[in-house]
Amino acid sequence: MSKRDILSVLDMEKDLSEIIDLSIELKKNRYRSYESLRNKVLGLIFEKPSTRTRTSLEVAIDQLGGHAVYLNPSEMQLGRGETISDTGHVLSRFLDAIAYRAYDHRNVVELARSTSIPVINALDDVEHPLQIVADFMTIKEKKGRFTNLKFSYIGDGNNMANSLMLGAAILGTDMYVASPKGFEPKQEFVEKARSIAKQHGSSITITNDPVEAARDADVIYTDVWISMGEESKKGEKEKAFKDFQINEKLVSNAKRDYIFMHCLPAHRGLEVTDGVADSINSVIFDEAENRLHSEKGVLYKLLSY
């Protein structure tokens, strides 16, 4: 069987909806004992800190009958100069899959090229595909559909914005992205998402007006303004994003039954107020829980052979 990598949301273009449905089914049967991935071993290489991704992946494969091995880059020969390629060739002999969280997307691609086992992008500077499965699973649970929705992302045009646009396009969801000038998503992702959206009768709209994005929204989503590794830009970005905070005034433009989403961790008082994050419209903790169930769906899809 040829290996399958998930480095981008595009690697799930043909079966994203199917993976989401599988994840929902696994959640419904969360207390059932599974041995689908018995004796399967998932390696975790994380260059960046993680709460949700690492924990949920470890629990996910355990609940499917396999187990995980955490590999700290600073404790590996990778941290002493061994190449990513050599590391990939060696780990392929021990593991059944690798989840890699990296600062540089090129390193994720290089690892995938050098392994004979699936490589999963567990977040890098370009995309966060695992988060997208959990996000749209949450939307399916809360709204019952992907189409005829206005999904608005308000914030930095970062890796999350890139992946969310691709996910929305694949699933036929109309999406607005509101970012300050100079902080919009990468044009290559906008163009690719619009091309896919056109095939599904949906649209991707880029704006610099957060009120336009929030108006009549069914879903409002945000992320941190300062991503990991961008600490030196804190002052600049806080100034640029001050009108893009998700607060009570902004969400008053949305539909009454809108849901608020955030991939977490949240910097409360910056990109979102406590009033919104803790409101009855907020689904951020359901969304976080769905990291577990959606990753079970992804791992089952990749490794149950």
Curated annotation (Swiss-Prot):
One MF term in the entry's GO annotations: ornithine carbamoyltransferase activity
Keywords: Arginine metabolism, Cytoplasm, Transferase
Coiled coil, from the record: none
Catalytic activity: carbamoyl phosphate + L-ornithine = L-citrulline + phosphate + H(+)
Transit peptide is among the record's keywords: no
Function: Reversibly catalyzes the transfer of the carbamoyl group from carbamoyl phosphate (CP) to the N(epsilon) atom of ornithine (ORN) to produce L-citrulline.
Protein name: Ornithine carbamoyltransferase, catabolic
Gene: arcB
